[in-house]
Amino acid sequence: MKTIRNRLLLLLAGVFLSLTINAQTGVICGNVSDAKLNEPLIGASVVISGTTTGVVTDLDGNFRIENVTPGTYAVSVSYVSYQTQVIPSVKVVARQEAVVNVKLSDADLQLQNVVVVAQRKLGTEMAVLNTVRNSLPVMNGISSQQIAKTQDSDAAEVLRRIPGITIIDDRFIVVRGLAQRYNSVWLNNATTPSSETDSRAFSFDVLPSSLIDNMMVYKSPSPELPADFAGGFVRVMTKNIPDGNSYSFQYQAGFNTNASFKTFKLTNRLGADFFGFGAGGRMLPGNAPAHLNNVSPETAAAFTKQINQRWGVKTFTALPEQKLSFAMNRSFNMGDMRVGNVTSVNYSTGYDYYEMENNRYQSYDMVNNASRYDNHYFDEAYKNTTKLGALFNWSLLAGNSKYEFRNFFNQRGTSSLIQREGTDYYSDLDVRYWESLYTGRTTYSGQLSGEHRFAEDVNKLDWTVGYSYANYNEPDRKDVYSKRNPDGSAMPYRVDEAKRYYQELNDNGFSAGTNYEHKLKVNDLFSPVIYGGLYGEYKTRDFEARRFGYNMLGNGYDRNADWEYSHLFTSANMGADKIYLIENTNKSDSYTSDNFLGAGYVSARLNYGEKLNANVGVRVEYYNLKLDGYEPDGVKPVNLDQSTTDLFPSVNVSYNFNEKHQLRLAYGRSVNRAEFREIVPYVYYDFERFANISGNAQLKNAYANNVDIRYEFYPSAGETVSLGGFYKGFNDPIEQTYHEAGSGVQYTFMNADRSEALGLELDVKKQLDFIGLKDLSFVFNGAIIHSKVYFKEGSFERNRPMQGQSPYLINTGLFYQNDNNGLSASVLFNRIGKRIETVGIPKQNPNDDIPDVYEMPRNSLDLSFSKKIGKMVEIKGGVKDLLNAKITYNQFLDITDPAGNTQTVNQLIRSYRPGVTLNVGVSVKF
């Protein structure tokens, strides 16, 4: 009772203190307008410099920041296409209003007590909304301000909030139902390296959400954009010059119901694993023979003893996920120049565990009307992922010029262990598969850029030079296969086969580009803008892999095992007459490749008054791809040298009925080129799908015609409703297919004949103040998409949806934000329709088809909250994936019996639950 009383008194004291503090605060208010036209600017951002406290202007350009502690502040006012103004000395007195009226201008000038900084801010919701509104290409975006309201920890999770986008494997994006290969990604102003060895994709989970200023997704082609996209062109801008000086620290802990405080298993770890750099300690020694098959068994046995023998499995209790970050923002004057720096370092480590059913099937048993397993397995998967990242960006503002030097680095290390057990019906054996794997990924992107304005902003020139590097290192993957007869006896599993595998990939990218803009004014109704630009990009890839197996001779050791192999692979058991490594590497396990892209464009933005705007232009791209490798037999060389030159016209038109209503129309031609890995014949084994993956040197480029129409309604500042439709027609679309290969399955890439996609998108952002809930806002975006792949006459193939395409997707959220008490919360929901993960192979008799594999629909619900305590501290928490719905992959086989009756058989391929994650964290900013 006494404890309850004390807590009640403490609560009442807190309420009293809060009321007292509010009574001792003041207000900053005023109006923001255009300096030339004297018209109010709707949605301008007004922020107290060095803090996150701010508002946007209303329909009359007015703003009001309440509960400001007495003192002197700098206030930053920004708006898209206007120069930011920082009012340095705004004095706030308790219970009084400090009035600040600001006129924003395009001109580079200096006003009394106002420092004009030529830096556009795009990190606020209003800034992104206005960028989308004023852009001629069809696009959507999200700001760092909106990201902060969610529990999203990386760029992949953030992208789910953008209309028309879904996520595959927690890191790859699907735009408008089109698979990740149809997207292009730039980090700031240059291309990103592919982070995967076996697909054309960028892994968005390497980008922490805290480093993102804004993300824009362009959905229609435009001359200044690269032509190699049909789904979306994604540009991620990292944080840059700040308004003031600040430091911030963040810590977050995450509890996962599958893993945290549960028994966990991994092979023995290295000290460098703690920072994600564990790959180096697992690589082959420098004195390794060039090929073991060229040496004697005695030499091979000696080498076998030399390489690491970390086969032991360590059992421990998994800790909750840990995330730490530090950020420093610096802004200062250097003479007449303004210098800014954003430095950030982040670290995270976490554990994941799931139990998965994993199946493959033979042809359907028509006699017994039943599915027949080929393999029926159950997996236990353990994974520890560590990420270390850094951002180091500099900006220099000097008169009419701006210079930026941006650097992004990420290191990711993943240690995993999979124990698979079940029945192999093909060989009629009980089997166990065991895989221990460590992967290291290194990503770096560096860019130096400049922007220069001339002749009172009539001419603008910008340029960028960039370098990117990606390393994927998979050292010492260990696979062990054990078996026993399925007779129900207690006979132990016996090791039948063991393998070790090493691979490393290095990508280097060099880029340079420039854009020029010239404004003309013919009369008051016609003010065209002429654009032109050049872009060059050169990429290289070096890939090398080595495969090893074990010769197991003699009987002087125990090959029986129960998920523990350290007793078998010991130095005592290794020798020329016992156990030693043999090499299975051939010439097809290595390849080199490079490509060059040279592009140029011209376009014109044409207008008729303020109502009609059009951007008309053409882009030309020269592309050269070279590859040197071998066919899977390691004998026949593969030497490719392919060049294409293509024109890509585009037209983007917008018509403004008034300041609230707008209609867009767009057409553009684009290309989808095969990536390095998709054309090289190298074969890689995917353990999760227990199948080989190989490329196809005969792949052709796919071309697409893209048409968009979208109506946009802007009810008030910060609100939007848009409804759009789109059509995409493809020639030679590239898809991943699979086919039977002996007793297993092999995946590869193929061109279909043609395909098309037709869809509708709806996006709504609405404040709920019209029903008296002024602190609540509602967000909804969804899409309905129909796609079909067509095949030539006489083909066994039957028309079906495009690979990776969802027939519908839904993202919706409810946001609460009260600036007076510093409390915010959100509820976010996501669902996708079923989509083809892998294309099957049809047969002449449909009953014998290898069906397509579908990822099934899944509901995802996230909750989050944050509470500010004073000016410096913020508490955050949330629940991720509250519903913990199964992630499921199914096949659907249409069967016709001899009597002509047809039924659809549902066959489970893979299924598991990822677990619910509860997060709580604290941030301190000063």
Residue ranges and their predicted role:
Residues 33, 37, 44-47, 78-82, ...:
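Short, acidic, small-residue-rich periplasmic hinge/interaction motif at the N-terminus
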Residues 27, 303-418, 444-448, 651:
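Transmembrane beta-barrel wall of Gram-negative outer-membrane proteins
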Residues 726-729, 748-839:
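Gram-negative outer-membrane beta-barrel transporters
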Residues 493, 505, 509-515, 694-700, ...:
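Outer membrane beta-barrel strand-and-loop segments of large Gram-negative receptors
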